[in-house]
A protein has these predicted regions:
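Short loop/turn segments that connect beta-strands within beta-propeller blades
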Residues: 74-78, 126-130, 182-186, 225-229, ...
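Beta-rich, blade/repeat-based domains predominating
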Residues: 44-55, 96-108, 140-156, 162-165, ...
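A short helix->beta-strand "capping" segment at the edge of beta-propeller domains
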Residues: 26-46
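Conserved beta-strand positions in repeat-built beta-propeller and related beta-rich domains
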Residues: 61-67, 114-119, 161-173, 213-219, ...
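A short loop-to-beta-strand structural motif that recurs across blades of beta-propeller domains
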Residues: 69-74, 120-124, 176-179, 220-222, ...
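Blade-level signature of beta-propeller repeat domains, shared across WD40, Kelch, NHL, RCC1
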Residues: 242-267
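A short beta-strand motif characteristic of beta-propeller blades
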Residues: 36-43, 80-96, 131-143, 187-197, ...
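Bacterial Sec-dependent signal peptides at the C-terminal "C-region" and cleavage site
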Residues: 2-28
């Protein structure tokens, strides 16, 4: 009975599971029936989320064109704390580069990694003193067309970035890529096509659950094998229109929409 369910398209309450025929087994899967809207950005902040990150305790939310500002969501109480430290804002803007707008963030021990929305720089901030310690500058493609870093994850050894290139005459397999980065050199040591989504939409989400990468684009959630870049499974979350951030806290995926909404998807 289970195999029959996995080999068919399951659609319940506006949610769909799209199985990959190459998949042999699934390790642990989200409980898609329990997807829940849990928070909205505070009204005093621009309602445009660019990325999410989990710091080991709470969920961090960065703002698109927010000049380094961010907010922290308490997972237990769902209360917000809005950043008011200019040193933090300055460091984020410095690493994000063009237009001072982060497109992806993730925590790696005592480092906060930031990728610019316009793909011109990425690097990390030492969270002990909030200095922009390392910045890797330069676009991934030497091309005048717009590019963007739109989601970051740390797997314990490497940084992963969801990258978008606004060359719409090319197939998405060339313009939407998952980049594997050596954190010491900033060099790309692996490249895989991202699951397809809206060609001209740079909003993404990317995170690591200890075994797999998770990627969100539009309404489509994908789990990805980091060794091969193969999509293991996909879930269509109809309630989410324009995902812009993804974070894993050990129990659930937190999903941001560009319009300021925060969703929680338990496993």
């Amino acid at each position: 009975m289970k195999s029959m369910l996995l080999c068919s398209l399951l659609t319940v309450a506006g949610l769909s599971f799209l199985p990959n025929p190459k998949t042999k087994s699934l390790i642990s899967n989200p409980n898609i029936l329990e997807l829940k809207l849990v928070a909205q950005l505070p009204a005093e902040l621009p309602q445009r989320i660019s990325s999410l990150a989990y710091d080991g305790k709470n969920i961090w939310v960065t703002i698109y064109h927010g000049r380094g500002h961010y907010a922290v969501l308490d997972r237990s109480t769902l209360d917000w704390k809005i950043s008011d430290d200019d040193k933090h804002h300055k460091a984020i803007k410095e690493v994000a580069g063009a237009f001072e707008s982060p497109g992806g963030v993730c925590f790696a021990k005592d480092r906060l990694w930031v990728g610019g929305s316009y793909g011109e720089s990425f690097g990390y901030i030492n969270t002990q003193d909030w200095t922009a310690t390392q910045i890797f500058k330069g676009k991934y493609r030497n091309d005048p067309a717009s590019q963007g870093y739109a989601g970051m994850a740390y797997d314990g050894d490497h940084i992963w970035i969801a990258w978008h290139w606004c060359r719409y005459n090319l197939p998405t397999s060339q313009t939407q890529l998952l980049l594997k980065i050596d954190p010491e050199t900033g060099k790309v040591i692996g490249e895989y096509p991202l699951p397809e989504g809206t060609p001209n939409d740079v909003t993404h989400g990317l995170t690591w659950d200890g075994t797999r990468l998770w990627h969100m684009k539009d309404s489509k959630l994908s789990s990805i094998d980091p060794a091969s870049g193969e999509v293991i499974a996909q879930y269509y979350l109809r309630q989410i229109r324009r995902a812009s951030g993804l974070a894993w806290d050990g129990e659930a995926l937190w999903i941001a929409e560009f319009n300021g909404k925060i969703w929680r998807l338990p496993f």
